[in-house]
Amino acid sequence: MSHNSFGHLFRVTTWGESHGLALGCVVDGCPPGITFTEAEIQSFLDKRKPGQSKYTTQRREPDQVRVLSGVLLGEDGVTMTTTGTPISMMIENTDQRSKDYGEIARQYRPGHADYAYDVKYGIRDYRGGGRSSARETAARVAAGAIARKVVPGLEVRGALVSIGAHDIDRSRWNWAEVDNNPFFTPDAGSVEVFADYLDGIRKNGSSVGAIIEIVAEGVPAGIGAPIYGKLDQDIASYLMSINAVKGVEIGNGFEAARLTGEENADEMRMGNDGKPIFLSNHAGGVLGGIATGAPVVARFAVKPTSSILTPRRSIDKDGNEVDVMTRGRHDPCVGIRAVPIGEAMVACAIADHYLRHRGQTGRV
């Protein structure tokens, strides 16, 4: 199986399966001299880890990260400094229950990658989906924690903006609310609505999708490239690689098709500091594939997980018709834990383009 790596200069390779002994990543191309602690990486992993509320899978994984290479440990025994060599990180699996998947070892779960993996490779890991499981994304979150350190002044934040047909009220957007509720939503008024809705979904053994918005501030103007090396192109590609993601927008996205040229174009003026400013940000911080210095804004849609208790019609490896009901522990809305994953992937894309821009122009 190939295609386990992404990035050009800031290159990340992930490894491991949902029910294996461990999973992890290797970050290659990280500049030397960047300092961080395992606790900083852990803070992002804790946001993604399962079992934190009744609205996520009850699989209990501490997701404790270990940095194995590519750093020098400081005299304080805590601070690590990158050496410029590959940074390897590992997260052990401690709460896998493969017996839950015995019934579907030969059955194809509707909506999952079971059949696609089997038809391509002639073999699949039925225990939680193997590499196709969202468990793999823990390694991406660890890599994203490093990526945030590569670009000085970069801040990447994410929030859940809709669950099913329920949208937040954007007039109540407050970033301070995101970490104060189990849905990572910036609208405190939507928390009770989301909770009541997901309670019903969860009790019925069903699932629902979500939309997540990522905002990156402090992105240097000029990074990115025209045509085939666009910053927004790579952000979209990185986000589409996340399990269950079915759509990505940059800036106004599909809504731009409903606007006139006067409504959509971002007008400019000179700011008080003598630097250009945009009077709006319909473009989402990218024009011609190159960052403008405005916040980079992306949204991605996550489908409902196909692991539900409702019996669904399918076939097995022998072509027999079967009804499949997925047991085990699953998220009623995988979009909740996709928030830190989306943040990580956007951070990795920006870090890669930052290094590419520096290498090509000598400027940042």
UniProtKB/Swiss-Prot annotation:
Cofactor note text? Reduced FMN (FMNH(2)).
InterPro entries from the entry?
Chorismate_synth, Chorismate_synth_AroC_sf, Chorismate_synthase_CS
Q: Which UniProt keywords apply?
A: Amino-acid biosynthesis, Aromatic amino acid biosynthesis, FAD, Flavoprotein, FMN, Lyase, NADP
The UniProt GO MF terms for this protein read: chorismate synthase activity; FMN binding
- Which ranges does the record mark as transmembrane? none
One cellular component term (GO) for this entry is: cytosol
EC number(s) per entry: 4.2.3.5
Q: Where does NADP(+) bind?
A: 48
**Cofactor(s) it depends on:** FMNH2
* Pathway annotation: Metabolic intermediate biosynthesis; chorismate biosynthesis; chorismate from D-erythrose 4-phosphate and phosphoenolpyruvate: step 7/7
In this chain, FMN is annotated as bound at: 131-133, 243-244, 288, 303-307, 329
- A Pfam family recorded for this sequence: Chorismate_synt
What does the record give as the reaction this protein catalyses?
5-O-(1-carboxyvinyl)-3-phosphoshikimate = chorismate + phosphate
| Gene Ontology biological process | amino acid biosynthetic process; aromatic amino acid family biosynthetic process; chorismate biosynthetic process
The first-level EC class reads lyase
Tell me the subunit arrangement. Homotetramer.
So what family is this one in? Belongs to the chorismate synthase family.
Question: PANTHER family this protein is in?
Answer: CHORISMATE SYNTHASE
Outline what the protein does: This reaction introduces a second double bond into the aromatic ring system.
Q: What is this protein called?
A: Chorismate synthase
Q: Which gene holds the coding sequence for this protein?
A: aroC
